[in-house]
Amino acid sequence: MANKTVLFNKHLESNGKMVDFHGWDMPLNYGSQIEEHHAVRQDAGMFDVSHMTVVDVIGDDACAFLRKLLANDVAKLKVPGKALYGGMLDHNGGVIDDLITYYLSDTEYRIVVNSATREKDLAWINEQVNGFSVEVTERPELAMIAVQGPNAKAKAATVFNAEQNAAIEGMKPFFGVQTGSLFIATTGYTGETGYEVIVPEADAEALWQAFLEAGIKPCGLGARDTLRLEAGMNLYGLDMDESVNPLAANMGWTVAWEPADRDFNGRQALEKIKAEGTDKLVGLIMDAKGVIRHGMSVFFTDSDGVEQQGIITSGTFSPTLGYSIAMARVPRSIGDVAEVEMRKKRVPVKVIAPSFVRNGKQAF
């Protein structure tokens, strides 16, 4: 029996096409994935992300615990509400999950983890907490709605009350604030401006309806995937997992090597990987017809004339750009051209940094 979010009936009201997503009944689209994609790039769209898992980490050792648990360093967070992105690694340096951590105070943090990895994440976190004076509390009574797009903030402002609008006025990216019953954060998974709003389940339907009446278009998993891929954002399970280290997943910037004496999980293994060298994640664009898909092979010839091979981790047709884009894990010796094997033919592609569209515009 699939899990249903508190917004399940709202999806049906908007003719959502429901599919199983890691054990959750979630909307793939509400009629047109392309229209939903363009709504977020050009106007405002909203997503039910209530299947994500909110976990509060509270106690005297909360900071010390998270400095051990995460490859990024929460000690960098000094201003209440400031957030950071990073990986939770195993002892081999593999990515257990990628997550966002909000600093609320020196003894209180909030983390948001992926739905597909919830059980293993919670098991790992609870295993690691031994010896720390910390309470780890899952918050299943909270739902979450993401409103994204160039007009998302203005439209959301017509829904929030005066106190909430005052609390978020001028809030920079990657911050969150509790205001009234809502936790409103300037985060997202689309490459557009907007908010992710954590709301008590009892209030979620009314908030969704208010956003709908404010002209924010419901968007499903299909658009969420094309938007995040255009933005060059990883999807756990495709672009990285426990078999992949963050340096090979374009997450090197999220590893805080300093201070050198912070012994975060996986550090020793990752230092060895860094010294020996590892693959990297690149972006690919293809002018030819067709769509690059996950699992296809990538070939290129290195500077020594040796053929090298990599693999597509995520690929799609980009509605914004009008051609196929992909992310691929490849040997570091790759240049700016390669070939992708499609239907037993090799098709030329350009190699770029893994970021294609930001704030509605081409990013390369």
UniProtKB/Swiss-Prot annotation:
Gene Ontology MF terms: aminomethyltransferase activity; transaminase activity
Domain of life (superkingdom): Bacteria
A Pfam cross-reference name: GCV_T_C
One GO CC annotation: glycine cleavage complex
InterPro entries: GCS_T, GCS_T_bac, GCST_C, GCV_T_N, GcvT/YgfZ/DmdA, GcvT/YgfZ_C, TrmE/GcvT_dom1
Chain coiled-coil ranges: none
Catalysed transformations (reactions): N(6)-[(R)-S(8)-aminomethyldihydrolipoyl]-L-lysyl-[protein] + (6S)-5,6,7,8-tetrahydrofolate = N(6)-[(R)-dihydrolipoyl]-L-lysyl-[protein] + (6R)-5,10-methylene-5,6,7,8-tetrahydrofolate + NH4(+)
Listed Gene3D superfamilies: Aminomethyltransferase beta-barrel domains, Aminomethyltransferase fragment, Probable tRNA modification gtpase trme, domain 1
SUPFAM superfamilies xrefs: Aminomethyltransferase beta-barrel domain, Folate-binding domain
Keywords: Aminotransferase, Transferase
EC number: 2.1.2.10
TM region(s), chain numbering: none
GO biological process, one term: glycine decarboxylation via glycine cleavage system
Function: The glycine cleavage system catalyzes the degradation of glycine.
Family under the similarity heading: Belongs to the GcvT family.
Record note on quaternary structure: The glycine cleavage system is composed of four proteins: P, T, L and H.
Protein name per Swiss-Prot or TrEMBL: Aminomethyltransferase
Name of the coding gene: gcvT
